[in-house]
UniProtKB/Swiss-Prot annotation:
The keyword Cell membrane applies. Keywords: ATP synthesis, Cell inner membrane, Cell membrane, CF(1), Hydrogen ion transport, Ion transport, Membrane, Transport. F(1)F(0) ATP synthase produces ATP from ADP in the presence of a proton or sodium gradient. F-type ATPases consist of two structural domains, F(1) containing the extramembraneous catalytic core and F(0) containing the membrane proton channel, linked together by a central stalk and a peripheral stalk. During catalysis, ATP synthesis in the catalytic domain of F(1) is coupled via a rotary mechanism of the central stalk subunits to proton translocation. This protein is part of the stalk that links CF(0) to CF(1). It either transmits conformational changes from CF(0) to CF(1) or is implicated in proton conduction. It is a peripheral membrane protein. HAMAP family: ATP_synth_delta_bact. Belongs to the ATPase delta chain family. This is ATP synthase subunit delta. InterPro entries: ATP_synth_OSCP/delta_N_sf, ATPase_OSCP/dsu. GO terms for molecular function: proton-transporting ATP synthase activity, rotational mechanism.
Length: 178
């Protein structure tokens, strides 16, 4: 996965620069989300990974599935990715594009992991505290994981705030080992 994102990043940067130059960030977000969803489909993934399928057939099928929802530049991106055997990294390109867009807009992505689903009020309070801490708008998603036992774990970029019971128990065990 790390290799795929490394390969995808230059494509995402190039597309982001083009989209920003043409004032078409929203259009590109939609096109990349669509293309990523198509590329991530189980049947399409098998088709993409099949060495017996030639590039022309892959390009034709992929573009026919996307219909008229890609503009000329989007179609050219698909053709380029097919030509260089990179169509399978479309989900990573889309994710990197969205990360660049969020960074440029001053928005931070946060993933909140909780043992139980937080209420709307709790979720709003967490987001407000994160926005105050980082001084930026925060878009958060919640993942429920009973394995953390209680509390929450928050990941914002490279920052991890582990206020989970499991994390505290692991820290205690580490401290006791000396």
């Amino acid at each position: 996965m790390a290799e795929a994102i490394t390969i995808a990043r230059p494509y995402a940067v190039a597309v982001y620069r083009l989209a920003k130059e043409k004032n078409a960030l929203a259009d590109w977000s939609q096109m990349l989300a669509l293309a990523a969803a198509i590329a991530a489909d189980e049947q399409m993934r098998a088709f993409i990974d099949n060495p017996k399928v030639d590039a022309a057939d892959l390009e034709r099928v992929f573009l026919s599935v996307s219909g008229d929802r890609l503009n000329e530049a989007g179609t050219n991106l698909i053709k380029l990715l097919v030509e260089y055997g990179r169509l399978s990294i479309l989900p990573e390109i889309a994710a990197a594009f969205e990360a660049l867009k969020a960074q440029d807009e001053g928005v931070l992505e946060a993933e909140i992991t909780a043992a139980v689903q937080p209420s709307d009020a709790e979720f709003s309070a967490i987001v407000k505290r994160l926005e105050a801490k980082f001084g930026k708008k925060v878009e958060a998603s919640v993942k429920v994981d009973p394995e953390i036992i209680g509390g929450i774990k928050i990941v914002v970029g490279d920052t991890v705030i582990d206020a989970s019971v499991r994390g505290q128990l692991q820290e205690l065990a580490y401290t006791l080992k000396g």
